Amino acid sequence: MFYIHGNPSASICGRVLLLFFLLFSHAVHAQYSVSANDDNAIKWRQIQTKSFRLVYPDFYEADAQKLARVLDTVSLHIGNSLGTTAPRIPVLIHTNGSKSNGLLVWAPKRMEFWTTPPPDHYAYPWSWQLALHEYRHVCQMQALNKGITKCLNAVFGEHILGAVSGLLVPLWFMEGDAVVAETAMSPTGRGHTPEYKMLFKAQLLEKGAYKFDKAKLGSRRDYIPNQYVFGYYMTAFSRSIYGRDVFADVMESTAKHWWRGAWFSKAGKRPYSDSRVYEQMADSLLRVWETERKQWLEKENKSAIEEIEIRKRHYTNYKNPIQIGQDSIIALQSSSFGLQTLVLITKGKVHKLRSLPYLKHSYFDYKDGKVLYSQESANQRWGQQNNADIIEYDFRKKKYRLVTSDAIFFNPVYNPVDKNIIAAIETDRKDNQSLVILSPGNKFLYTKNVLQKNKHQYIASIGKENDVAFSFPCWSEDGKALYVIETSVYGKCIAKYDIATGKRSLLTASSYDDISRLQIRNGRLYFIKDVKGKYELVSMSLESGACTVESDTEYGISSYCITETPFHDDETGNHSDETVKERNGNVDLILSAYNSDGFRLVRSKAMALPVDLNEPNPEPLFVSDLRKEEGFILDASFMNDTTVAYESKPYSKPAHLFNFHSWAPFFMNVTKQDLGIGVSFFSQNLLSTSVLQFGYKYNPQDIKHELYLTYNYSGFYPIFDVETNYKMRSMLLSSDTTDLYAQWNEWMSGLNMTLPYTWNTQRTVNKVSLVANYSFRKLVPRKLINPHEEFRILDLFNTFGLGFRLSMLSAQAYNDIVPSWGEVIKLNYKTTLTSNPAEYFSFSSTTYVPFIFKNQ
């Protein structure tokens, strides 16, 4: 134990200096966010308003106008409950890729949207959800831009806010508050869906409340609801007991007084204690959910389930079950300890068929010993242009077949009549989606070189509805029509498309209740729907439109399989309501039902209880109060005003090559994570193709003074790296016979050119790079003192080199530290370009192989 005595102001100064050092150290080790590159052939345009600069590909103009209206409207309301307004910020749009995501970073500050609608999204437009969630993050950062933090940010640049938020504001608040915003300011939101409740409710009822640190930080061993789920309930509960503006107060106090130790959990006019709030929240939710459990157990009509016994060592999910034969089920297994894997379950024993780590949306279809699915496919050079290929895997022959390439397809399904015909959802580079029918037949091709554009496979492309996203198509029983879920500004509905005529007919009205996973059996359409706060199985008579609930589990389900007892139609061949009711009593189900150990497989009978799809579900906890507090809903009524048009201009890449966003009163080498005495300046453009760092470094050893510059440009296919520095060096050597003291200036520069190529297989990501580099070093002597000998100095030194890099690494599970399988090879050759040449050759290889223990 030690004590510091002296002037209190000196103690405060010391604390400030320590925290100041920690901020910049955090900035170094967190590095700056450099995104993957878009295709350099894209021409960019921009829309500028007082709130944002929207940058997007030129072919995305119509959708960019709509998104600009959304952002402009959201910016007026999104920061109110944080006591701030949205600052002006760049927004970069990535299209023409299979990724669906949003990102906010603050060094340099920007939002990035990957706008391809995912089929497993809830009942709300994908880009609208991105706007609400990510813009709330912007306001969180702006709420920190006060007091001493604002002063430091004005002086040193954008990385100050990023460092303050990363060090002092918990991630659960950042993500949970953003989920609260998307829920409170939309007719739905993730906090409104049954998923969040299901995950947290099962944990509290069956495992109990974990200690706060474990609940907040997560666990590699036990399943803990993530920062989004945990954070949503923490933030919503905090507002319910402290009021709407609780976090406006906490963030302001943190921003102004962090240097005094008033960090997030100790900030506010009435200090906020997150650990105390967690205890109160857990107790409150537990009482509510114990009451719900008691009511469910007392119900007469609920699913009688028989669990399919599978040995579980840890939290594991089994989804997308499909029964094959009498005793076997294929399903998708996933956990943090292993890769997403296709498994065969027979009499309680699990046999791994194939790891499918890049399978999209946990979805596949099955027919005659083959599974059909969509898989992530890496672009050879441009990281933002990834595709989603359709793959067929014959697990009996253990062979893959590539069905499509160089396009984006989701949710492929076999035709029930002709296995050589499949349907899928195709997304183009403008985010327009359509239902496509493909006929690869028996001529599946193994190479992408032959099947580049999927030509000669299309039978039809239907269902191109404006501003509509599709998900989970299924065929009619005669294979002549497609049923599909449509998502629009009005929510989700189910539609039918006649393939021959393209005619569309609506089966359900649009609703913000989430629905997914369509299947048709014996004249009934089955799907998963939000039923009174849980995801349950519902079916609809295609003849009468009457609907019934087929399951009622404790927490909800994610997927299902219908394994009905054979039932014959009446003499007319029709399915009357009476025959349907009689048949439903014979329908056996396999459900992927949730509990605290993950999604398990259970057997159950269809319940066939009448339900009205138009009856509204009860509001989840907190949602009504949150919406009243925010006082703004982004819904379909927002689309009524179509008169607003924004001026669009070309976005010049050369004119925006440099964006100086931050500097530091230290030497900071972000690439090498090095920190020292000096000063550093940073620039990075919006497209992440131009990254510049330069500054001054002082070294108390032999290099007294150094000016340095590093620059990376990745806007062309080759990637160029330039590094140069100018040093003032000195050296003193002493021995019994002689003393040498030398001073000289040293100028070193190098140019590196890399040609990368990336591809992936079913289980590995592979990269190969060819590297060429040139460097020179020039010495300018300033002083040389040696009384005994003369020394010759090589004042100019040039080198040229070539390199080869190859990495083939298996996909990693969440808990993996390094890949289980893989190889990394590096070859380097370098020669001097002088009168007395010297050569250098190196080879290194790193091999990853499994061991007795997992690398976790």
Question: Where do the language-model regions lie?
Answer:
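Transmembrane beta-strand segments of outer-membrane beta-barrel domains in Gram-negative
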Residues: 723-855
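Outer-membrane beta-barrel initiation region
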Residues: 298, 314, 320, 605-717, ...
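A flexible loop/linker signature enriched in serine peptidases of the S9 family
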Residues: 191, 315, 333-342, 354-361, ...
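Juxtacatalytic substrate-recognition/specificity segment
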Residues: 30-164, 170
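A short beta-strand motif characteristic of beta-propeller blades
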Residues: 305-312, 349-355, 398-404, 444-449, ...
